[in-house]
UniProtKB/Swiss-Prot annotation:
NCBIfam families assigned to the protein according to its UniProt record, in alphabetical order: ileS
Top EC group: ligase
Name recorded for this polypeptide: Isoleucine--tRNA ligase
Listed InterPro entries: aa-tRNA-synth_I_CS, aa-tRNA-synth_Ia, Anticodon_Ile_ABEc, Ile-tRNA-ligase, Ile-tRNA-ligase_type2, M/V/L/I-tRNA-synth_anticd-bd, Rossmann-like_a/b/a_fold, tRNAsynth_Ia_anticodon-bd
One annotated GO molecular function: isoleucine-tRNA ligase activity
GO annotation, cellular component aspect: cytosol
Protein's organism: Pyrobaculum aerophilum (strain ATCC 51768 / DSM 7523 / JCM 9630 / CIP 104966 / NBRC 100827 / IM2)
Subcellular location field: Cytoplasm
Organismal lineage: Archaea, Thermoproteota, Thermoprotei, Thermoproteales, Thermoproteaceae
Its EC number(s): 6.1.1.5
Subunit field text: Monomer.
Length: 981
């Protein structure tokens, strides 16, 4: 692109800017030049791979904007950046979308559809959405990631590292198969890990029932328990009490009958009130330990006869509390981790009458073939009919749901595969303490989760995922753990006729026949692995670290990762766990935790609510830069962001101001033949005015603060600071001061000094802004910077980060005071009804420290003939803090004609712009009016009007084709024509 070849239209047009810039980047291979290593220090970024199972939305765009800001920042600082992209392309999220697409409702439906076809459908789906993510989640955002070399979790060379991790765990004795109580999704028919469960908590309404268990041998004597899962009573095996709590035998009257209920003594009054029982008394008390051994009759003995065949009794447990319920806890060892451990302690049977799909098996007696959630209601109904239901209500509480399909989870005992995280969590915690987690207020959440980490259930009863690399000898039950595809091929006596991609996926891997280690038939455990293990190995698998050791050692540990707050229990956690297991080290140095993104009403976004904002819609309407700057400016990255699309227009307004400032510079520099290399700042600054030194001081402070904000991930402060500098400091202040100098046709040294200063300021503003808004800054760099500085870097993104120079504090204070005084003066004029364009005789300034220093500037800014220090009580006065400004409450008659002349000038300038005249074009002006005042203003200020509007001819006459205006209640018609050369 020739220097300065891009045009500068009258206003900022995001879509046209994006199109031109993308073409420039493509044609000149700017990204390739940008990402190439030049021997500098390294800054390595690890991409948290988005799952390509749907369209990117504004939540994704928020996080990816933060990533881009940090990467671009360090590249400008001179670092060699590592920006490999990544895609998460397996697991339950993908399967769930395919099931919806194919209208499959269960695992049985998948099997009938065919595992091969289903796996291929999953692969096709992620391919389809990958195209959207490359375009709308990356390119249109301006996010510079290396997508040509992006890692994909589905690829053989990548997922083999999950096998390596499992094999290493096996070698360290950390891989175990165990029978435990776990959370299951009955819809997806698979177990879930603790961190997956933590991702899906949501508030819901559930039954809350109080039930009587009849004491064996007692006369109308009962143990009263409480539960929110009535279906688990089917598998009840005991009732637990705290050994040290006092329990009361309470005599109550129910339906005309006298009964005796055992409850925690401390809870009796509140429970009686809840149950609506007015007549009651405590007849006996015992400590929990004394109740141990008391036998009771299973409340569903008739419905589930198998339970009636063995005794049930009271046991003691330290985990019993008085916070909820009755102080007596119903124990179902197959449906609760604490219940399960208690069963092991007392030798209780672990009954599990519920299958993985939530359906009762033959152990469920009369409930066989029914779903737990249907049985919930049925059990309550049966207990009521038997007179065992004491009280029922609904309760709202946080309960785990499937993090992908949203189904309510169930606890059930099953045999699964685990990595014993409990044995390395102390090391994980120690390594985490070496990591800079931002913000500090959220690192506690991460710390606590790691400190309490439980063994990682890695097996999933699904199809599209990384196969669990564990084979079992059919003859003797020994296990074989395979750590690579090469090892698998070496041990295989028969392989299916497929490529490597299919070979490492179900169902093809299950067709591999292995004969080794004195076993003729090894059968693979029928699981895929937790999808969080897939993304959790990115720290090494992304670059095939074992086969590219030199590269990996330059990258690891990665300098920066960032994702949402839920990833403290998701990706951040799985990265830490796998890395510590494999290397003994944390895989990252800096973790930025992002807040949630909400709709404008503060509600969570969801498809069901219809309030999701899609990236495609946003970018098509507003363009990327306005969306980026809005996201960056609104709140701190770690705070929840309520996204209001209507607010993006304010950002567009600020970017348009930047555009206008650059256009202002281009207009006058072009007229005067400015060349930044001919008029270098170092040589011309001393020829300038004090205001030039002031703006450079403000710039240097801004650069220093901006840099620190970005380094500390305070993007909201950096973006706000940059916007304020552009809009207020540069446009509203410096440019306002500059206009009187550049409008002059005399080629004075201070004018070229002003150009040199303005060019330096704009250049540095664009470089800083390039990390925030990469498209508009590139466009202005090409259209303006390279036009006036031929040897400027080819792209703003290839420029060098500006150093923060020295600054004059006193000068800054003086000018900030000047503009505070000007603000007060403008407010006083407004209250007096005197426009800023209208001159006033004098203004009084009181309480200003530097008033004498900037008197001339205040006269120019405030359109005041004379500025005096002091106060004038008979004038209209406005106070701002310690400052006070007083002005006349009406315009003096002798200044009225000058005011009218200024009004005429404004109208003529508007008409020049409307007719598309260049700033250098000279014009003829005809004014038609019946107003003697207007005529007098033209005659008296003819030279002034002509000079300000570049009019070579100004007459009062009839107008044939003009525009009618109202000036102070007088009708005026004005016609302008370009003067012929």
């Amino acid at each position: 692109m020739p220097h300065g070849d891009l045009p500068l239209p009258p206003s900022y047009r995001p879509h046209e800017v994006k199109k031109a810039v993308e073409e420039f980047w493509r044609r000149n291979r700017i990204f390739e030049k940008w990402k190439s290593w030049r021997g500098g220090p390294k800054f390595t970024f690890l991409e948290g791979p988005p799952t390509t199972n749907g369209m990117p939305h504004v939540g994704h765009i928020r996080g990816r904007t933060y990533k881009d800001v940090v990467i671009r920042f360090y590249r400008l600082l001179g670092y060699d950046v590592w920006v490999q992209g990544g895609w998460d392309m397996q697991g339950m999220p993908v399967e769930w979308e395919v099931e919806k697409k194919l209208k499959l409702r269960s695992k049985k439906d998948i099997e009938q559809f065919g595992l091969e076809k289903f796996a291929l459908e999953c692969n096709s789906l992620v391919e389809e959405y990958l195209a959207y993510w490359r375009e709308w989640g990356t390119k249109r955002l301006g996010l510079w990631l290396d997508l040509e070399n992006a890692y994909e979790t589905r690829q053989p060379h990548y997922l083999q590292y999950a096998w390596r991790i499992v094999k290493r765990a096996h070698e360290l004795g950390l891989l175990t198969e165990d029978y435990r109580v776990l959370w299951f999704c009955p819809r997806c028919e698979t177990s879930l890990s603790d961190h997956e469960v933590a991702l899906g908590y949501d508030e819901r309404e559930d039954p809350s029932i109080y039930v009587k268990f009849r004491v064996e041998g007692g006369v109308d004597e009962y143990l009263v328990i409480w539960t929110t899962t009535p279906w688990t009573i089917v598998d009840n095996e005991a009732v637990a009490v705290h050994p040290d709590y006092v329990y009361a035998k309470v005599e109550v009257e129910v339906g005309g009958r006298r009964e005796y209920w055992w409850l925690a003594e401390a809870l009796v009054p509140s429970l009686m009130a809840k149950f609506g029982i007015k007549t009651w008394r405590v007849v006996e008390t015992k400590k929990g330990v004394e109740l141990a051994g008391v036998r009771y009759i299973h409340p569903l003995a008739e419905e589930v006869p198998e339970r009636a065949s063995r005794p049930h009794q009271v046991v003691t447990a330290e985990f019993v509390t008085l916070e909820q319920g009755t102080g007596l806890v119903h124990i179902a060892p197959g449906h609760g981790p604490e219940d399960f451990e208690l069963a092991k302690k007392y030798g209780l049977p672990v009954t599990n009458s519920v299958e993985i799909n939530g359906i009762y098996n033959e152990l469920g007696g009369r409930y066989k073939g029914k779903h737990v959630y249907d049985v919930d209601k049925e059990v309550t109904r049966d207990l009521r009919s038997k007179g065992l239901l004491v009280f029922e209500e609904k309760i709202r509480h946080e309960y785990p749901h499937c993090w992908r399909c949203g189904s309510k989870l169930i606890l059930r005992a099953d045999r699964q595969w685990f990595i014993a995280i409990s044995r390395i969590r102390d090391k994980m915690y120690a390594e985490l303490q070496k990591v800079n987690v931002v913000p500090t207020k959220l690192r506690d959440r991460f710390d606590i989760f790691v400190q309490n980490a439980r063994d990682w259930n890695i097996s999933r009863s699904r199809v599209w995922g990384t196969p669990l690399p564990v084979w079992r000898c059919k003859k003797d039950g020994r296990i074989l753990v395979i750590g690579s595809l090469e090892e698998l091929k070496k041990l295989a006596k028969e392989l299916p006729p497929v490529d490597d991609f299919k070979l490492v996926h179900r169902p093809w891997i299950d067709q591999v026949k292995i004969s080794a280690h004195d076993c003729d038939e090894w059968v693979r455990e029928p699981y895929v692995m937790d999808v969080w293990l897939d993304s959790g190995i990115a720290w090494i698998a992304a670059v095939d670290g074992e086969n590219n050791r030199d590269l990996w050692e330059k990258l690891f540990p990665y300098d920066f990762v960032t994702e949402g707050i839920d990833q403290t229990r998701g990706w951040f956690y799985s990265l830490l766990a796998t890395s510590v297991l494999y290397t003994g080290r944390a895989p990252y140095k800096n973790v930025l935790i992002q807040g949630l993104i909400l709709d404008k009403h503060g509600q969570k976004m969801s498809k069901s609510k219809g309030n999701v904002i899609w990236a495609k819609d946003l970018f098509e309407k507003y363009g990327a830069d306005p969306v980026r700057l809005y996201i960056l400016s609104k709140v701190a990255p770690w705070e929840d962001l309520s996204f209001d699309p209507d607010e993006v227009k304010y950002v567009i307004g600020d970017l348009n101001i930047l555009w206008n400032v650059v256009k202002f510079a281009d207009t006058y520099m072009s007229l005067d033949g400015f060349d930044a290399e001919k008029y270098p700042l170092s040589q011309w600054l001393e020829k300038g005015l004090e205001e030039d030194k002031w703006i450079l001081s403000e710039l240097n402070i801004m650069i220093s603060e901006f840099t620190n904000f970005v380094k500390n991930f305070e993007f909201h402060k950096a973006a706000a600071l940059w916007r304020e500098f552009v809009v207020e400091t540069l446009s509203h202040r410096y440019i306002r001061l500059l206009r009187r100098r550049v409008w002059s046709e005399e080629p004075s040294p201070d004018k070229y000094a002003a150009y040199a200063v303005l060019h330096d300021v704009l250049k540095k503003v664009l470089i800083l802004g390039s990390i925030l808004v990469p498209f508009i800054t590139e466009y202005l760099w090409q259209a303006y910077v390279r036009k006036y500085e031929k040897n400027a870097p080819e792209s703003v993104h290839l420029a060098q980060y500006p150093a923060a120079g020295s600054y004059d504090k006193e000068l800054i204070y003086a000018y900030r005071e000047l503009f505070a005084v000007f603000s007060a003066l403008a407010e006083a004029r407004n209250k007096a009804g005197i426009k800023l364009r209208w001159p006033i005789r004098e203004a009084y300034v009181n309480g200003a420290k530097y008033a004498e220093r900037y008197t001339e500037l205040l006269k120019y800014l405030g359109n005041v003939k004379e500025v005096k220090v002091g106060r004038r009580p008979d004038y209209l006065c406005v106070k701002e803090g310690e400052l006070e400004v007083c002005v006349p409450d009406k315009i003096e008659p002798e200044l009225y004609y000058e005011a009218l002349a200024r009004e005429l000038i404004r109208r003529i300038q508007v008409m020049r712009k409307e007719t598309g005249l260049e700033i250098s074009d000279e014009i003829h002006v005809v004014v038609e009016t019946n107003s003697d005042d207007i005529k007098k203003a033209v005659e008296q200020y003819r030279d002034y009007i002509a000079r300000e509007t570049r009019a070579v001819k100004l007459i009062i006459d009839a107008v044939s084709q003009g525009k009618e205006w109202d000036i102070s209640g007088e009708k005026v018609k004005i016609e302008i024509r370009k003067a012929q050369a």
